[in-house]
Each structure stands twice: as C-alpha cells, then as structure tokens.
C-alpha cells in the first residue's frame, strides 16, 4: 500500500524535455513552483531535433524549389532550380542550432527549473527515482508528475526491410546530411502529418 509523504521535495516533476514537458515546466516555474525536469536525451525533444523545426526548414527550401519550377504561375520565367542537397540539409541543421538555446538546460535553469539529465522511474504516485547520466541515483518526492515522454517511429516488420536499409523521421536528418544529392527514389511509409510533409518536400527537391 502506498503512503503519501507528509512533505514533498518538489511541487512538480516533469519527465521529458520536449515541447509538452518544457511548456509544463515553464508555466509551473512562472508560478513559483519547485519544479524538476528530467530528460534522458536532447532538450527540445522531437519538435526541435527531429520534427517541427527541421521539417519546416526543409519545407521552406522545397517550396522555393517548387516555385522556381512553376514561375509562370506568378508571371515569371520558369527554370530548373540549381541547388546543393547537402547545403539544404546543412541549413536545416543551422536552423536547429539557432532555435536550440531557447530549449536549453541553461535557459530553463535561469527560469527557475531544475534540469536533470537521466532516466526517471515512477515508484509510487508521489515518488520518482532518477538514474543520472553520471551513474548516481536520486530519489525525489513530488505533489504532481507530468509524463511527457513523447513517442518513437514504429518500424514495421516488413520482409527485406533490414537488408535494403531505411531511415526513420528521427534518423534521416543526420543520414541525409551526408549525401551530396537527394535519393533517386524514396518510399515513405505512413500518411500522417510527418509522412506527408517529408514526401512532398523530398519530391519537390527531386
């Protein structure tokens, strides 16, 4: 049987440093709550590193390439866009670096949030056990817990997929950044927002 602590180390513990976790921690800290944010990977989570930010940067470049090809729609002469795929991806990573300080440990620490790098495990409704990146353990009690751990791409068990090789919406940004040219062909599995954005962007980039 669980026993509610008589007093708490924190008002709020947030597990996950992505968009939802950062907003939760920010609002709580603004209300002068004692907040700890726990993140085991990159601050900013999916949105900054693999989702919203890089995809919108890619979409912008792809849109410009599309408009150059279809200049007559705007009363302009058309032409084939001349670009470097490597430079397009380099710009994407540059945009990530520009936005990253807004989601950084340093910024959230300055806002009054304690940021811990490590893995969290909830042991009861008020207790979180944290294995820090340096190998040490820390246990904190809290009045409330926000679980904002996000999700990962699902790789379907398709025959031959491992042999052919694939990227996910997480890994393509680093893998494609090493290419001088866009892949000659690309199959996108998944018709959700991420799949549609990537399919359109890479089609427009050739």
Language-model features: where?
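Short glycine/serine/threonine-rich phosphate/pyrophosphate-binding segments
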Residues: 19-27, 46, 194-204
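Rossmann-like NAD(P)H-binding beta-loop-alpha module
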Residues: 178-206
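A generic secondary-structure micro-motif detector
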Residues: 14, 93-94, 188
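Glycine-rich flavin
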Residues: 1-10, 26-33, 38-183
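Generic signature of intrinsically disordered, low-complexity, basic-rich segments
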Residues: 15-16, 116
């Amino acid at each position: 049987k669980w026993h509610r602590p008589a007093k708490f180390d924190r008002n709020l513990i947030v597990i996950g440093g992505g968009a939802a976790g950062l907003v939760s921690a920010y609002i709580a800290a603004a209300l002068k709550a004692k907040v700890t944010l726990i993140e085991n990977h990159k601050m900013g989570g999916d949105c900054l590193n693999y989702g919203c930010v890089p995809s919108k940067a890619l979409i912008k470049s792809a849109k410009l390439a599309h408009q150059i090809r279809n200049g007559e729609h705007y009363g302009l002469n058309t032409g084939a866009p001349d670009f470097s795929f490597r430079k397009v991806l380099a710009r994407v990573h540059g945009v990530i670096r520009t936005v990253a300080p807004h989601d950084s440990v340093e910024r959230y620490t300055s806002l009054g949030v304690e940021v811990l790098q490590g893995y969290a495990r909830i042991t009861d409704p008020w207790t979180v056990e944290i294995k820090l990146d340096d190998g040490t353990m820390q246990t904190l009690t809290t009045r409330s817990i926000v679980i904002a751990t996000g999700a990962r791409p699902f790789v379907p068990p398709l025959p031959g997929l491992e042999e052919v090789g694939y990227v996910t919406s997480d890994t393509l940004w680093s893998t494609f950044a090493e290419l001088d040219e866009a892949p000659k062909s690309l199959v996108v599995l998944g018709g959700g927002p991420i799949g549609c954005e990537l399919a359109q962007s890479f089609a427009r980039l050739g």
